[in-house]
């Protein structure tokens, strides 16, 4: 039986995917085939690191080279993809498919965006083409790609999925400044920057009392609020900021040294209470 015929039989225009038991059987069967290194098309989420192409893992490069289709997020029609820029050396002769993730828009409907993305991806796979979805940083930290993976697993159990982790901006920033993210017996909290003064103040004070290490992500437009609280809590001289890690405009310095009134979207703060 040829691979093309097998694929058509398994997908069967979506009819067989309606039965959960059949979904499970197909998924196990395809996983077994994949274990024996068949060339069935796959969907792979690839973490590409924070911005520096030299931080790409070997596994990430291998997956990109093998895929026929490279899907990557953009914020709107006129903007480039940071993730696509990182891997452009390996994607010149691929099908490069941008998908709009307008996260900053107030009318953003995540369910519609994820569903449309899944529909595009599934069509390529049903045509026998392996797809890689690029993910900036690591695939497990604030990654929109996890929503797409969830939908594919729930609605297209016959598709073989893989996830390749990448270096996060947190670990990259820590390494660039010899910053210990967490030592034996310590706790690390990774959290998106709170929008209110009271929430951020509580987070910092509780972390200080428990000597918990803080990694505050996506500071961006909230920098003025954050700066004022860092001053009030007398930790502005020891709080490490990292902006656009791995990118040409990278900045890593202590918060007291940063004089601008705003921060870019890709911004984080690392705080220890030694």
Question: Can you name each region flagged by the protein language model?
Answer:
Residues 2, 6-14, 22-53, 58-60, ...:
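Class I S-adenosyl-L-methionine
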Residues 77-80, 104, 168-171, 189, ...:
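Short gly/pro/ser/thr-enriched loop/turn and capping motifs at secondary-structure boundaries
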Residues 81-83, 107-109, 172-173, 193-194, ...:
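Short, charged, surface-exposed secondary-structure boundary motifs
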Residues 109-119, 176-179, 201-207, 252-258:
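Short, surface-exposed amphipathic charged segments that create phosphate/polyanion-binding patches used
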């Amino acid at each position: 039986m040829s691979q093309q015929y097998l694929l058509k039989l398994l997908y069967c225009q979506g009819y067989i995917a309606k039965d959960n038991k059949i979904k499970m059987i197909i998924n196990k069967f395809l996983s077994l085939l994949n274990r024996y290194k068949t060339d069935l098309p796959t969907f792979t989420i690839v973490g590409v690191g924070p911005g520096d192409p030299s931080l790409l893992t070997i596994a990430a490069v291998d997956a990109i080279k093998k895929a026929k289709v490279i899907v990557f997020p953009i914020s709107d029609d006129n903007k480039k993809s940071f993730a696509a820029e990182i891997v452009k050396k390996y994607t010149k002769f691929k099908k490069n498919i941008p998908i709009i993730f307008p996260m900053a828009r107030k009318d953003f409907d995540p369910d519609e965006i994820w569903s449309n993305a899944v529909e595009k991806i599934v069509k390529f796979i049903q045509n026998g083409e392996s797809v890689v979805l690029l993910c900036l940083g690591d695939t497990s930290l604030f990654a929109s790609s996890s929503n797409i993976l969830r939908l594919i697993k729930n609605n297209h159990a016959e598709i073989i999925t893989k996830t390749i982790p990448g270096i996060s901006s947190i670990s990259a920033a820590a390494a660039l400044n010899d910053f210990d993210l967490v030592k034996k017996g310590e706790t690390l909290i990774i959290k998106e920057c709170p929008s209110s003064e009271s929430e951020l103040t509580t987070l910092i004070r509780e972390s200080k009392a428990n000597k918990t290490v803080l990694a505050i992500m996506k500071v961006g437009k909230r920098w003025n609020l954050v700066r004022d609280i860092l001053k009030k809590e007398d930790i502005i001289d020891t709080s490490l900021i990292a902006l656009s890690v791995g990118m040409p405009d990278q900045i890593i310095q202590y918060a007291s040294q940063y004089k601008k009134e705003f921060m870019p979207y890709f911004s984080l703060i690392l705080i220890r209470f030694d």
